[in-house]
């Protein structure tokens, strides 16, 4: 089965990414993105519960339209939203008590925004305003494949640096992983590949945590699924987005 995957063909890899992340027919998709964010402080001989601890949960979604351009690249137009939730209860946060600084701080109401990007045979093309350096850029797309019977595990990793005005650069090592059916992957007529998706990221502290020079970093774990109807998203998330970003989910994509 591995031989039929064209695993070393950048064009097959590119189309696979487009079909996993969205629907190449041009149909709108909604990716539901719930997850957990941990604080990790290594090298200080801390007790297990202090070395690593769950800080908060996140919940969000990405509305996306994908299409194949004449040159074979995939254009993705999207808008994303992410909100923060209590580590234990999952209730949406307005304030957060930082266990490292012992300060109570205001939580951003919502994160995210619009984006237009392109997947190409020489890596993704992203808006220059992102200030992003990444090992994914300027290189053919590559995925790692494992096949066992009808199951396929697909993964990739990237190291990145995001530079934002008036703040220090933020470094990140991220790992993407999809699990899908081999028959869906090999179906050349299918414009979308159903899968479960996991994003794991080891990254610097978020600026709103006000960590200053406190040692340590964040470990993100987000598990996602792509759907075709807005109504398939959790009703509580839709209600929260209407509170913090009224009407945005119904706006046309950029």
Q: What is each PLM-predicted segment?
A:
Residues 4, 12, 26, 89, ...:
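Low-complexity, compositionally biased segments
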Residues 14, 32-34, 38-40, 58, ...:
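Intrinsically disordered, low-complexity regions enriched in small/polar residues
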Residues 2-88, 221-254:
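N-terminal segment immediately downstream of the Sec signal-peptide cleavage site
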Residues 138-254:
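A eukaryote-biased signal for long
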Residues 50-183:
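Predominantly extracellular/secreted and cell-surface proteins with exposed
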């Amino acid at each position: 089965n591995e031989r039929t995957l064209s695993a070393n063909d950048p064009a097959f890899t590119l189309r696979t990414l487009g079909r996993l992340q969205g629907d190449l027919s041009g149909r709108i998709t909604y990716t539901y993105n719930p997850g957990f964010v941990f604080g990790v402080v290594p090298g200080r001989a801390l007790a297990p519960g202090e070395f690593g601890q769950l800080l908060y949960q996140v919940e969000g979604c990405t509305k996306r339209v994908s299409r194949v351009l004449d040159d074979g690249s995939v254009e993705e137009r999207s808008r994303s939203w992410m909100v923060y939730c209590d580590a234990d209860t999952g209730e949406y946060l307005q304030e957060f008590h930082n266990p490292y600084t012992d300060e109570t701080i205001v939580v951003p109401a919502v994160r995210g925004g619009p984006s237009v990007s392109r997947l190409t045979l020489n890596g993704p093309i992203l808006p220059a305003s992102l200030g992003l350096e990444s090992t994914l850029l300027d290189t053919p797309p590559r995925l790692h494949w494992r096949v066992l019977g009808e199951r396929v595990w697909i993964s990739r990793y990237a190291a990145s640096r995001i530079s934002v005005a008036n703040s220090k650069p933020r470094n990140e090592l991220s790992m993407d992983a999809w699990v899908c059916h081999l028959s869906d992957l090999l179906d050349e007529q299918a414009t979308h590949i159903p899968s479960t998706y996991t994003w794991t990221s080891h990254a610097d502290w978020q600026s709103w945590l006000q960590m200053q020079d406190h040692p340590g970093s964040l470990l993100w774990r987000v598990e996602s699924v792509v759907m075709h109807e807005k109504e398939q998203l959790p009703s509580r998330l839709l209600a929260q987005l209407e509170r913090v970003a009224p009407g945005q989910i119904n706006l046309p994509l950029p």
